[in-house]
Design a protein with these regions (language model features):
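N-proximal low-complexity "stem/linker" segments adjacent to membrane-targeting elements
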Residues: 1-19
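Active-site-proximal specificity loops/subdomain of glycosyltransferases
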Residues: 43-102
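Catalytic core and acceptor-binding pocket of nucleotide-sugar-dependent glycosyltransferases
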Residues: 154, 163-237
Length: 238
């Protein structure tokens, strides 16, 4: 079993996420794409013992070695202004697609700011499904972004099945803020995946993700109370 995490300036949270995963489901291989521009995993004391584990692979993109974000955004000259997160949703979706192409196998996608509460093996037990997780409306519904999506906080992606059907997690024509053409810009993280799977006739499997994770969420990279969150949920990762 493999899990993949996209990290952006949250090394302490990402470390706790991995430890919580292993506490409840030992032996899962973990691949992390580090997109940090300030708090890199390689400089984090919290990762000192993790990076040497044979179960962990950290891919350093802190200098644009893998994905040059300036070049990436340059592909979308008519994009709308970013609402304060520098096109974070688009970058995250593209990072997930990069990881999918890189590992080429099914994996559990986890946000860097979730803590696993229980064994996640159930996510891997539906080989005929394109995804396993929970659908829901966009959290940006109050801004008119109401297209349904597969929640990205924790979900299983059956990469070989998606690849056979030509389905990609990232689609720049259906990614909010990358194009000014409505309604395409209303698609947030996981929304294109759900639409593409439905159009291809691929099934997903619903699981109540709140039973499996605790999520700091909503801009944790902005410096929300990380220490308090980790302290209150210490039993999940220590």
């Amino acid at each position: 079993m493999r899990a993949c995490i996209v990290n952006y300036n949250t090394p302490r949270l990402a470390c706790a996420a991995v430890l919580s995963l292993w506490k409840h489901t030992p032996g899962v291989r973990v691949t992390v794409l580090d997109n940090s521009d300030r708090l890199a995993i390689r400089d984090s004391e919290h990762w000192a013992g993790l990076v040497s584990s044979p179960l962990v692979e950290v891919i350093d993109n802190t200098k644009g070695q893998i994905v040059d974000w300036k070049e990436f955004l340059g592909r979308y000259p008519d994009r709308e202004p970013s609402p304060g997160n520098d096109y974070g949703s688009a970058k995250h979706c593209y990072s997930v697609q990069w990881l999918s192409d890189y590992v080429g196998e099914p994996f559990l996608l986890m946000d860097s700011d979730v803590l696993v509460r229980r064994d996640v093996t159930e996510f891997f037990l539906h080989p005929d499904c394109a995804w396993v997780g929970q659908t829901g409306e966009n959290v940006k519904k109050r801004f008119g972004y109401d297209i349904q999506k597969v929640q990205p906080f924790i979900c299983f992606l059956n990469v070989p099945l998606l690849q056979r059907h030509g389905i990609r997690y990232f689609n720049g024509e259906y990614m909010w803020n990358l194009t000014s053409v409505r309604p395409n810009h209303r698609y947030d993280t996981g929304a294109w995946l759900l639409r593409a799977c439905r159009e291809a006739g691929l099934q997903g499997h619903e699981l109540p993700i709140g039973d499996y994770i605790r999520h700091l969420g909503h801009g944790s990279w902005r410096g929300r109370p990380v220490a308090d969150f980790l302290s209150l949920n210490r039993q999940l990762w220590c």
